[in-house]
């Protein structure tokens, strides 16, 4: 593995796209990391401004620069709009640097699905190791380039993975119906009328119904497809007037009844070595995970025998920057929880 030993020197890290909410969250977490030094912050729309002009509560003394192909840092974290990282990552990787991309540019293996859900073309080679530590810890540790999961995808995959990948005998899933609610920060920092206070206060709405870009990412990771006729997956994303957090309610119809105890044992065993996944006895809440890298999971049964899985994450931390730092820790040989607890 191409690790940079923690004890030898501090690792230099630069953030491309540091002016957005996820980028700023990266800066906040990186400032707490004992093994790294923030080298540069790139944001072409804010070039020349000091980071603290945008985020006074985060005491980073860096000035935003314009990225023009620099490869002087050991690690590059990219928090750019979809489509932009495709142009930058190949050059950074070719220079022998480590990369973690937070966009959706390198997640999907199926190029037709990428075009359908994201727009634009990409080649079949434009896929990086998927960065979900709870599922791919060893692969991430041996990688030099990672595609960070999406925020909704993180909350839903972690809720479903034990059912699809845990190997419990007699547990067959017929369909999954997901309603997931996100805080407004999930829509990004750019000004949009529909996200303004007067539009969102006291309001709530569904969006991208039937066409959210995280749907094929979820299916790919769970080992099925959005076009598989034998499996029914319905995902309804919603936005609500709070700042951060994703609350996902997953209603899972099973082919035959199962008892709660073996299901809880399945989840507990599956995540036994996952420091950021917590199986809760009661119903979890967004406030339980806000500003943390935790994913909380609650389990219950409906009267018809359907399994109800509830997950809660912070969309900017576990759903973005925190998971990226978790991946970086694994890539570089740091403790997985460094700067996150």
Swiss-Prot record:
Keywords assigned by UniProt, alphabetized: Amino-acid biosynthesis, Arginine biosynthesis, Cytoplasm, NADP, Oxidoreductase
Compartments where located: Cytoplasm
Protein name per UniProt: N-acetyl-gamma-glutamyl-phosphate reductase
Subcellular location, principal: cytoplasm
Top-level enzyme category: oxidoreductase
Catalytic activity from the UniProt record: N-acetyl-L-glutamate 5-semialdehyde + phosphate + NADP(+) = N-acetyl-L-glutamyl 5-phosphate + NADPH + H(+)
InterPro entries per record: AGPR_AS, AGPR_type-1, NAD(P)-bd_dom_sf, NAGSA_dehydrogenase, Semialdehyde_DH_NAD-bd
UniProt key word Cytoplasm: yes
Species annotation: Chlorobaculum tepidum (strain ATCC 49652 / DSM 12025 / NBRC 103806 / TLS) (Chlorobium tepidum)
Membrane-spanning parts: none
Residues at the catalytic site: 151
The protein's Enzyme Commission number: 1.2.1.38
Gene Ontology terms: biological process: L-arginine biosynthetic process
Superkingdom of the organism of origin: Bacteria
Record-level Gene Ontology MF annotations: N-acetyl-gamma-glutamyl-phosphate reductase activity; NAD binding; NADP+ binding
NCBIfam families per the UniProt record, alphabetical: argC
Protein purpose: Catalyzes the NADPH-dependent reduction of N-acetyl-5-glutamyl phosphate to yield N-acetyl-L-glutamate 5-semialdehyde.
Pfam families in alphabetical order: Semialdhyde_dh, Semialdhyde_dhC_1
This protein's pathway: Amino-acid biosynthesis; L-arginine biosynthesis; N(2)-acetyl-L-ornithine from L-glutamate: step 3/4
């Amino acid at each position: 593995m191409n690790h940079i030993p923690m004890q030898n020197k501090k690792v230099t890290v630069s953030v491309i796209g540091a002016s957005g909410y996820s980028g700023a969250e990266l800066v906040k977490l990186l400032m707490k990391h004992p093994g790294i030094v923030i080298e540069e912050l790139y944001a072409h729309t804010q070039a020349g401004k000091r980071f603290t002009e945008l985020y006074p509560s985060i005491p980073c003394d860096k000035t935003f620069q314009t990225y023009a192909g620099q490869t002087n840092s050991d690690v590059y974290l990219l928090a750019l709009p979809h489509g932009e990282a495709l142009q930058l990552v190949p050059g950074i990787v070719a220079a022998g640097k480590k990369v973690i991309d937070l966009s959706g540019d390198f997640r999907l293996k199926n190029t037709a699905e990428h075009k359908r859900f994201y727009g634009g073309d990409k080649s079949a080679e434009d896929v990086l190791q998927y960065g979900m530590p709870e599922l791919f810890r060893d692969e991430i540790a041996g990688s030099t380039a990672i595609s960070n999961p999406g925020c909704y995808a993180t909350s839903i995959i972690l809720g479903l993975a034990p059912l699809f990948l845990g190997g419990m005998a007699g547990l067959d899933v017929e369909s999954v119906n997901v309603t997931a609610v996100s805080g407004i920060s999930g829509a990004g920092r750019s000004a949009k009328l529909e996200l303004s206070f007067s539009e969102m206060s006291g309001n709530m709405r569904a969006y991208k119904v039937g066409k959210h870009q995280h749907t094929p990412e979820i299916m790919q990771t769970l080992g099925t497809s959005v076009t598989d006729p034998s499996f029914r997956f319905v995902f309804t994303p919603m936005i609500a007037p709070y700042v951060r957090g994703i609350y996902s309610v997953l209603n899972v119809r099973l082919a035959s009844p199962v008892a709660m105890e073996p299901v809880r044992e399945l989840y507990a065993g599956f995540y036994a070595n996952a420091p950021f996944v917590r199986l809760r006895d009661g119903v979890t809440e967004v406030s339980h995970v806000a500003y943390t890298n935790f994913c909380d999971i609650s389990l219950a049964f409906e009267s018809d025998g359907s399994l109800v899985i509830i997950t809660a994450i912070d969309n900017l931390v576990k759903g973005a920057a925190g998971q990226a730092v978790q991946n970086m820790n694994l890539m570089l040989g740091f403790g997985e929880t460094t700067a996150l607890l």
